[in-house]
């Protein structure tokens, strides 16, 4: 931990009851760390409590979103390593040391919650489904897709600023973007404390749909055929099944079979073209990196 500077970023909205104690504990455990609190349009004295505890406080003029607060923190942080954690006191600052010991070898380390650490049974089941879907997309076993407690190298986080949404779904975007871009990721088990005050702002259905859309978006952005190919295959099988059935029962090739076959081919070609565009973007990015010279 002595070889690099660490910035701890705490997005907070109406967390006056917990933010001060959290900042004090971080500073007590890690005196040399930069602690940044992004006050996301709080209507209580969150900013004052954080400032009195010794944090560097930056405020949004109104509530923009948890992801927007993270992006603001990334922009102003000066550390080589950025640690993101919630401002409600559920994350234990002592776990940060366990993250950082892996940082020389990994680009991002994420705290993985146990099933018991999930806020509710419904959310635990939903997260399990999203973990499975994201693992398929990323070709990597994702233990906790939505965990907001993580450490990431600053250069990696900044490279995805344009993709991170303003909402609570930023962990999903960051995790999938890191994996699909070829950066390394490590999961570390953590325990989550119960909220002492307030309640979670995450809505299971609304945010669940958003998580699904983000997984699809990231997949089509970084590995389009992982989405297009299965859809094309299913339509082809349906078309083939319909063709065999109508051929045996009616002795002809129906319009439905033709439609399914044609749609299957179109979707496959769309995936192929998207994959080529994706590859060209990778090549352009690597070309830009190769032009950077050390002073």
Each language-model region and where it sits:
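Residues at alpha-helix boundaries and short interhelical turns
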Residues: 13, 164-165, 267
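Conserved catalytic loops of nucleotide-sugar-dependent glycosyltransferases that act on lipid-linked
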Residues: 65, 69-77, 90, 94, ...
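Membrane-embedded multi-pass helical conduit in multi-pass membrane proteins
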Residues: 224-295
């Amino acid at each position: 931990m002595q070889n690099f500077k660490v910035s701890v970023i705490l997005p907070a909205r109406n967390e006056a009851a917990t933010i001060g104690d959290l900042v004090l504990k971080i500073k007590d455990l890690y005196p040399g760390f930069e602690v940044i609190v992004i006050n996301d349009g709080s209507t209580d004295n969150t900013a004052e409590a954080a400032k009195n505890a010794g944090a560097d406080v930056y405020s949004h003029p109104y509530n923009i979103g948890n992801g927007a607060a993270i992006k603001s923190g990334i922009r102003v942080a000066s550390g080589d390593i950025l640690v993101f954690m919630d401002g409600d006191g559920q994350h234990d600052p002592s776990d940060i040391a366990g993250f950082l010991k892996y940082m020389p070898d990994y680009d991002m380390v994420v705290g993985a919650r146990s099933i018991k650490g999930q806020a509710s049974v419904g959310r635990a089941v939903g997260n399990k489904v999203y973990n499975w879907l994201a693992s398929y997309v990323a070709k990597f076993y994702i233990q906790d897709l939505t965990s907001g407690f993580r450490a990431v190298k600053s250069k990696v986080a900044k490279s995805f600023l344009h993709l991170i949404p303003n909402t609570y779904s930023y962990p999903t975007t960051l995790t999938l973007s890191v994996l699909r871009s070829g950066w390394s990721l490590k999961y570390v088990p953590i325990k989550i404390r119960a909220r002492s005050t307030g309640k979670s702002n995450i809505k299971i259905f609304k945010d669940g749909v958003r998580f699904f859309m983000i997984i699809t978006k990231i997949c089509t952005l970084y590995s389009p055929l992982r989405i297009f190919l299965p859809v094309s295959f299913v339509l082809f099988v349906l078309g083939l099944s319909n063709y065999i059935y109508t051929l045996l029962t009616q002795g002809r090739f129906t319009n439905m079979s033709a439609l399914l076959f044609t749609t299957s081919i179109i979707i496959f070609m769309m995936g192929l073209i998207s994959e080529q565009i994706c590859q060209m973007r990778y090549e352009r990015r690597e070309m830009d990196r190769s032009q950077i010279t050390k002073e």
